[in-house]
Design a protein with these regions (language model features):
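Residues in and immediately flanking transmembrane alpha helices
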Residues: 15-16, 85
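Immediate post-signal-peptide N-terminus of mature secreted/exported proteins
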Residues: 18-60, 112-119
Length: 119
């Protein structure tokens, strides 16, 4: 996921303002990813290792973490459209949701019946 979002950047801008903004965007995405990894790992560490799936409340808690991640990624992309590669300037929230849902982590969690209704 991180590689895809970082790939959204325009690498060819020469202006200092544009370069600074692009760098800020990269830092923002890196921070969002770090926060998500920390929150999701904390949640997963709190689970009983013997359980076969998430309870309804656990599913709701985890999906809230994922929804926050999607919201923050989309907000970062939306606020920095001018610094994204032309092919990614029209990325929508559904595109971000599809990328997150197709991530390796989310695919692994499907076997535990984790299915988040992301919006």
């Amino acid at each position: 996921m991180k590689k895809i979002l970082l790939g959204l950047l325009i690498l060819g801008y020469g202006g200092n303002v544009l370069a600074a903004s692009a760098a800020e965007y990269v830092q923002s995405v890196e921070q969002i990813n770090a926060d998500y990894q920390k929150e999701s790992r904390q949640f997963l560490k709190g689970l009983n290792p013997q359980q076969q799936g998430f309870s309804a409340s656990q599913n709701q808690q985890f999906c809230a973490i994922v929804q926050c991640y999607v919201d923050r990624l989309y907000k970062a992309a939306d606020q920095n459209r001018a610094y994204l590669d032309r092919q990614y300037q029209n990325v929508g929230k559904q595109d971000v949701i599809l990328q997150v849902k197709s991530s390796k982590e989310m695919q692994l969690l499907k076997r535990y019946n984790v299915d988040c209704n992301l919006q």
